[in-house]
Regions:
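N-terminal lobe/hinge region of extracytoplasmic solute-binding protein
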Residues: 8-61, 92, 243
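Gly/Pro-rich hinge or "lid" segments in bacterial periplasmic/extracellular proteins
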Residues: 135, 140-145, 153-190, 203, ...
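A bilobed periplasmic-binding-protein/Venus flytrap-type ligand-binding module shared by bacterial periplasmic
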Residues: 261-266, 320-345, 349, 358, ...
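Ligand/substrate-recognition segments at binding pockets and active sites
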Residues: 397-471
């Protein structure tokens, strides 16, 4: 009799390319198939070589050169040998995806390695001409210096108009004229974090542009699982099902159902199960009944109301740490959300306490955009997120907001580790925004549509209900996904501005169409047309979500809010400068202090509103032994046993 492990998750893999689909439903499949150069320790998250593709990982004294010595006799499931050249080709693929116009917004995990903002800022051309070699050496040692002057000038030029709310009306015409005549500034160019990857004496040598505490940890995530390069197409997208070196291989994948069989070429301990079947059941009720009826052996995202009965019936219900973030992504290129006062108003309007009823015990309010498990101490952490409806209304008055429509995207007909019932959470959340006078229009999207749209550069998308589990043990595992849309915007803009003037096709032809976050660090005047359309909440996407959904209120007239002074905000360039400084620190303790500044800056700039640090539960049948939950919500099945 075959030993088959049957697992149900709440969302189908969008695709089976982990580099372009960095979501749990994809990773849960590829984790059984692909291996990475480094693996995170289960308890500490520290990168190590145990169970990885490497037998040795060496870092140079200056922390710029990382050498990966591969294990011998490792083969892909199709029999092809793993070589250093294979790994180099995978790095080249990640670079192409992170920097390409069509893929920059999707290849979020590879952004810190190759995309805009995380490497070393380049000097302007006129300065390069006169710079000597010693100055170049200084830039390498102090990677953030190059951005300092331009970042400071940017902050001074954009923050000052918002200091006095009474000047808002007087400056309307001048501001509008300035906005129509001010040219779009050329983005700062960056040397990527990874400057070179080459094969040397059978090893892989990676050279960085600056020291990075996160680099090794970044490589532990499934997005960097090594794939047979024979599957890389001309555009570097996969031409078929990924082939890896892990304990299993993908036999078939169709309509959210994936079948995996043991990899006959695997050089590790043979799994004690003969087959894995991963299916998709989008509601917790369906997963619950499939489990108790013996149709599946385990499932993700157990509803809190079912935990008691499952425990009484002898099922295992292991939980995960709340190493996650549920948040509202605020599109700084949107004509209304470009105004910093509107973004701050949303942060002060949200009622986080009302959302807890849809999450398991252990979920907590998120006051910042990073997990509290990093123990980063900040002054007044609630300053930018405390609920204060009066302040929210005053900030909207300061912005000149007048019922302009803001669309809010959220995933429908899906269940995710960070949100089991998106419709309920959306309805509860949006009610608090409507109460302060915001005109929110819901945009429910299928899982595939949501994944494609939530990070793409756009001036149409307003708010998005978003979330994730941290994929590696570093603060940038949280900051990176939150800032990904802005990084993708800058990356694509860099492609446009650096294209030859003679180019008449491709990215250069789309320059005028690019959305812009320019001015998002100030109280820039809202130019969008007010709308008579009222806010509303849609009907639940699923019948089972209809219970306990709070209806969105109709805004009621309130006394005219008084504009308030708007504190200056750091620019996005300054925030990235602070992130680079923290990531270049010599120790985790030093990094923690530097990231406290980043948290404060993000609280002022408010590119996203933190909502919750959510936990989730797994339910496992009595016949399954050895199931171990992981902090990043991606579990490995190769060591399971079935009785």
């Amino acid at each position: 009799t075959s030993r088959i492990f049957r697992f149900a998750q709440g969302a189908a893999p969008v695709q089976l390319d982990p580099a372009l689909s960095p979501v749990a439903s994809t990773y849960q499949v590829t984790a059984q198939v692909l291996q990475t150069l480094l693996v995170a320790d289960h308890y500490t998250g520290s990168p190590e070589t145990t169970d990885s593709l490497c037998r040795e990982w060496k870092i140079s004294d200056d922390r710029l050169t990382h050498t990966f010595v591969l294990r011998d006799n490792v083969h892909f499931s199709n029999g092809t040998a793993l070589t250093a050249a294979t790994v180099v080709q995978n790095f080249q693929r990640w670079q192409a995806l992170a920097t390409g116009e069509a893929t920059a917004a999707l290849a979020v995990p590879a952004q810190p390695l190759y995309a805009w903002g995380f490497g070393v800022p380049e000097q302007p051309a006129q300065q390069k001409a006169s710079a000597d070699t010693s100055a170049a050496s200084s830039d390498t040692a102090s990677p953030t210096a190059g951005a300092s002057a331009s970042a400071t000038a940017d902050a001074q030029s954009t923050a000052s108009p918002s200091a006095d709310p009474m000047s808002h009306g007087a400056q309307k015409d001048a501001d509008a004229k300035a906005e129509t005549t001010k040219p779009e500034p050329k983005p700062v160019s960056f040397t990527p974090l990874v400057t070179s990857v080459k094969e040397q004496d059978g090893a892989v040598v990676v050279t960085l542009s600056r020291p990075s505490l996160s680099f090794g940890r970044i490589l532990t995530q499934q997005a960097f699982g090594i794939i047979d390069p024979a599957l890389f197409g001309g555009d570097q997208k996969l031409t078929g099902i990924p082939v890896g070196t892990g304990a299993f291989r993908i036999e078939s994948s169709e309509k959210g159902a994936v079948r995996l069989l043991p990899n006959e070429h695997f050089d590790g301990a043979r799994p004690q199960i003969d087959e894995i079947q991963i299916s998709t059941l989008t509601s917790s009720d369906k997963r619950y009944f499939a489990l108790v009826e013996g149709i599946i052996d385990a499932c993700d995202q157990v509803n809190s109301s079912d935990l008691g009965q499952l425990a009484r019936d002898g099922y295992q219900t292991p939980g995960r740490d709340p190493f996650s973030l549920v948040y509202l992504n605020l599109n700084t290129a949107h004509p209304v959300l470009k105004n910093i006062s509107v973004r701050r108003a949303i942060a002060h309007a949200v009622d986080r306490g009302a959302l807890h009823q849809y999450y398991p015990q252990g979920t907590s309010d998120a006051q910042t955009l990073v997990s509290p498990s990093f123990r980063i101490q900040t002054d007044r952490p609630k300053e930018h997120t405390d609920r204060n409806q009066d302040l929210s209304r005053s900030l909207l008055a300061t912005a000149g907001y007048s019922n302009q429509v803001i669309e809010c995207y959220y995933p429908a007909d899906v269940s995710l580790p960070w949100v089991d019932t998106p419709q309920k959470v959306y309805s509860e959340m949006v009610a608090s925004l409507i109460e302060v006078g915001l005109n929110i229009v819901p945009v429910p999207l299928t899982w595939e549509q949501y994944h494609a749209k939530v990070n793409e550069p756009s001036s149409t998308r307003g708010i998005a209900l978003a979330g994730f589990y941290g994929m590696y043990r570093d603060p940038y595992a949280f900051f990176g996904p939150v800032l990904a849309p802005m990084i993708a915007e800058q990356q694509v803009r860099s492609l446009v501005t650096e294209a030859p003037e003679s180019m008449t096709t491709g990215v250069k032809a789309k320059a005028a169409e690019l959305p812009s976050s320019e001015g998002a660090d100030s109280n820039i005047r809202i130019q969008a047309t007010p709308s008579p359309q009222p806010s509303f909440s849609p009907s639940p996407a699923n019948p089972e979500e209809s219970a306990s959904v709070s209806p969105s209120p109709t805004p009621t007239p309130s006394p005219s809010a008084t504009p308030v002074p708007v504190d200056a905000s750091p620019s996005f360039l300054q925030i990235m400068e602070s992130i680079r400084a923290a990531d270049s620190a010599e120790s985790v303790d030093a990094q923690r202090e530097l990231y406290a500044k980043v948290i404060s800056q993000l609280g002022q700039f408010m590119p996203a509103v933190p909502l919750l640090n959510a936990t989730s539960k797994v339910a496992v049948s009595r016949s399954v032994q050895g199931y171990q939950t992981e902090q990043n919500a991606i579990e490995f099945f190769s060591k399971l046993r079935l009785s």
